[in-house]
């Protein structure tokens, strides 16, 4: 459902940002 995708996208986005911060 849209809600599931939204939650997954939000979690993935946060993790992606953290990875970028660690690498940066």
From Swiss-Prot:
Tissue: Antenna.
Superkingdom: Eukaryota
Keywords tagged on the record: Olfaction, Sensory transduction, Transport
Gene Ontology biological-process entries: sensory perception of smell
Family: Belongs to the PBP/GOBP family.
Subunit note: Homodimer.
Chain's role: Present in the aqueous fluid surrounding olfactory sensory dendrites and are thought to aid in the capture and transport of hydrophobic odorants into and through this fluid.
Protein name (database record): General odorant-binding protein
Organism in which the protein naturally occurs: Antheraea polyphemus (Polyphemus moth)
Source species taxonomy: Eukaryota, Metazoa, Ecdysozoa, Arthropoda, Hexapoda
């Amino acid at each position: 459902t849209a809600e599931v995708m939204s939650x997954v996208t939000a979690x993935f986005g946060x993790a992606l940002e953290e990875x970028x911060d660690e690498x940066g």
